[in-house]
């Protein structure tokens, strides 16, 4: 008898579950995506023990007929695609037909579903085996409960993380689905406590406010770009709002949350020199394209995708972000935190919106009532919204009107006023120096308030933009060295450097072989920082050694940043009045006067009104 045998369906489903059902968050993702594909407008998720004990997903979607109920738990059974042609034009979130049988094989599943046209159907499966099949109520939609996850695979259960960690993964999944589908109302509860509520009014800004909070949402600006193949729109945070990981970058392709490293790098490239090292923006991008241009059938989890025109898409995204940021004044506003009145807890509050604000919003300012003593822009009166009753399939507390709509209306008005001002003034308004603090910070003022400028960061930005233009230019003027510089390297490094002498020469480093494993430099461009020649050349050579593949654009960029750091004004260096004036004027002429090349802020602003509040001149 042969050694090779065909595995039975139950064992095959358990093996498939190893890829599809990694943790409770995987189950939530698959069930909620099914609800989205079923044209639901309200989706409720209830958890116990972060989903390990119980996951319940209720929707008001199309539901299933009795025959489909049983077939749905068979492997590779799906209503999403019919033939090979459909596989290359996928418009639904699910399509593989693996999720339900995989989930059922490692848990206990109870599903009630109905199309609303007749009696519903109830099925119960344990470990993939059908134990109950009967008629039930006819409420349209699906109510599916997954209990005792991994009860028959204890090895998998043993490797689950803490409840807090697993709950974090579930929340992350639901948050991204909510951002991808702002027209659906999502409600997430854990042991009855509400963790997320979105109104489903179609405005993604409301979803961003629900997830990240109003303070962050108010510091996110809209972006939009379009090409022949792609449409990109979304919201990006101002450079002053950052996080320590890329996990806050959400990219949605045709309604599906995806991970794509080149796309994430394209987003970061749009913030070039605007963010400190190790800090990342908060980004929501929704990208629409012909399904044939993206392959979502790369991994069973359907998170990783491949694009047919990846370079074109990445360039479009980078330029869209860059243009949106270049149109803004990126000076961080220093705000005085107000004492807030106690607010209802998350589980006691639901948001209802009927009015949808469609204009883009941008405002780094927190709303404050206008005091009579200070001439501030007039604020709009609160918009009174009629309450909208939202049906719920589970017992919920009474919904209360939230002030998010009012704040978004206000932000739109502030944006219009700000945009008008942008056309009148440069990105950095004229500043009038009034002093220097600790030989490190320049104090300046204008009619808008007080500005504090980091003098070292300011000169770094000025020099960086100067050297960025110089590095890579045709070098006509060179400075001969009175004493040539020599550099000795091990054989492996010498061979590597010698292979890239042409690229180094384009950056102003003129190397000539000079004996065994040695190079000599006899001249350099006239714009090289004086007194720093040896150190700069050595560090430029080191960049080539460290690069796995020498990229000229990246090499020039590193050269410009390196040179901008040399001989810039340092801390504890006192400047004359004329030097301060010259520095500020030079800063105004730069393209990005708000951060140094390393992403640190150059300037911060205290408005006159905020200063008045500090001294209790206004209340």
From Swiss-Prot:
Question: Which keywords are on file for this protein?
Answer: DNA damage, DNA repair
One annotated GO molecular function is: mismatched DNA binding
HAMAP family listed in its UniProt record: DNA_mis_repair
Q: Which GO terms describe its biological process?
A: mismatch repair
Q: Name one GO cellular component term.
A: mismatch repair complex
Q: Which InterPro entries match?
A: DNA_mismatch_repair_CS, DNA_mismatch_repair_MutL, DNA_mismatch_S5_2-like, HATPase_C_sf, MutL/Mlh/PMS, MutL/Mlh/Pms-like, MutL_C, MutL_C_dimsub
Query: Its function?
Result: This protein is involved in the repair of mismatches in DNA. It is required for dam-dependent methyl-directed DNA mismatch repair. May act as a 'molecular matchmaker', a protein that promotes the formation of a stable complex between two or more DNA-binding proteins in an ATP-dependent manner without itself being part of a final effector complex.
Among CDD domains, the record links this protein to:
HATPase_MutL-MLH-PMS-like (cd16926), MutL_Trans (cd00782)
Protein name per Swiss-Prot or TrEMBL:
DNA mismatch repair protein MutL
Q: Which is an annotated Pfam family here?
A: DNA_mis_repair
- Which top-level group of life is the source organism from? Bacteria
Q: What residue spans carry the Basic and acidic residues bias annotation?
A: 368-378
Q: Does the keyword Cell division apply?
A: no
Where is region (Disordered) located? 368-403
* PROSITE patterns, sorted: DNA_MISMATCH_REPAIR_1
Q: Which family would the database say this protein is a member of? A: Belongs to the DNA mismatch repair MutL/HexB family.
> Is GTP-binding among this UniProt entry's keywords?
no
């Amino acid at each position: 008898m042969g050694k090779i045998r065909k595995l039975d369906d139950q064992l095959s489903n358990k093996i498939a579950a190893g890829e599809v059902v990694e943790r409770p968050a995987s189950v939530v993702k698959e069930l909620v995506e099914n609800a989205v594909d079923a044209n639901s407008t309200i989706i409720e998720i209830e958890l116990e023990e972060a989903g390990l004990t119980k996951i319940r997903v209720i929707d008001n979607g199309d539901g299933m007929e009795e025959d489909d109920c049983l077939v749905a738990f068979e492997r590779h059974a799906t209503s999403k695609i019919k033939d090979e042609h459909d596989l290359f034009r996928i418009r639904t979130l699910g399509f593989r037909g693996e999720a339900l049988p995989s989930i059922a094989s490692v848990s206990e599943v109870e599903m009630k579903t109905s199309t609303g046209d007749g009696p519903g159907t109830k099925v119960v499966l344990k470990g993939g085996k059908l134990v109950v099949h009967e008629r039930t109520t006819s409420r349209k939609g699906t109510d599916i409960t997954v209990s005792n996850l991994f009860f028959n695979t204890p090895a998998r259960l043993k490797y689950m993380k803490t409840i807090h960690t697993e709950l974090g993964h579930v929340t992350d999944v639901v948050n991204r689905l909510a951002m991808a589908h702002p027209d659906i109302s999502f409600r997430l509860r854990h042991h009855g406590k509400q963790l997320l509520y979105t109104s489903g009014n179609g405005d993604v800004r409301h979803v961003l406010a629900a997830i990240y909070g109003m303070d962050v949402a108010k510091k996110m600006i809209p972006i939009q770009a379009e090409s022949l193949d792609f449409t990109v729109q979304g919201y990006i945070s101002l450079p002053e709002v950052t996080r320590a990981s890329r996990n806050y970058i959400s990219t949605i392709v045709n309604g599906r949350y995806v991970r794509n490293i080149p796309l994430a790098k394209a987003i970061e490239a749009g913030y070039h020199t605007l963010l400190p090292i190790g800090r990342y923006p908060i980004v929501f991008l929704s990208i629409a394209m012909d399904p044939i241009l993206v392959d979502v059938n790369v991994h069973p989890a359907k998170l990783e995708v491949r694009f047919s025109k990846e370079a074109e898409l990445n360039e479009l995204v980078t330029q869209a972000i860059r243009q949106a940021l270049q149109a803004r004044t990126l000076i961080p506003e220093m705000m005085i935190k107000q004492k807030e009145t106690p607010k209802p807890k998350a589980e006691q509050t639901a948001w209802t919106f009927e009015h949808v604000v469609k204009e883009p919003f941008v405002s780094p300012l927190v709303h404050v009532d206008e005091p009579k003593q200070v001439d501030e822009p007039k604020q709009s009166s609160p918009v009174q919204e009629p309450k909208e009753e939202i049906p719920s399939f589970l017992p919920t507390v009474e919904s209360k009107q939230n002030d998010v709509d009012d704040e978004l209306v206000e932000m739109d008005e502030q944006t219009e006023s700000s945009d008008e001002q942008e056309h009148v003034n440069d990105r950095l308004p004229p500043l009038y120096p009034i002093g220097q603090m600790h030989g490190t910070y320049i104090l300046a003022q204008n009619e808008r308030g007080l500005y504090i400028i980091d003098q070292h960061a300011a000169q770094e930005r000025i020099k960086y933009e100067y050297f960025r233009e110089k590095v890579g230019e045709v070098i006509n003027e060179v400075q001969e060295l009175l004493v040539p510089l020599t550099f000795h390297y091990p054989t492996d490094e010498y061979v590597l450097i010698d292979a890239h002498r042409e690229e180094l020469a384009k950056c102003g480093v003129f190397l000539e072989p000079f004996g065994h494993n040695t190079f000599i430099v006899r001249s350099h461009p006239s714009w090289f920082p004086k007194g720093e020649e040896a150190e700069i050349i050595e560090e430029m050579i080191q960049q080539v050694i460290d690069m796995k593949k020498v990229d000229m654009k990246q090499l020039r960029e590193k050269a410009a940043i390196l040179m901008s750091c040399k001989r810039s004004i340092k801390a504890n260096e006192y400047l004359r009045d004329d030097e301060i004036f010259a520095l500020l004027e030079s800063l105004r002429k730069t393209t990005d006067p708000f951060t140094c090349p390393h992403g640190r802020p150059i300037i911060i602003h205290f408005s006159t009104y905020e200063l008045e509040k500090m001294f209790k001149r206004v209340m």
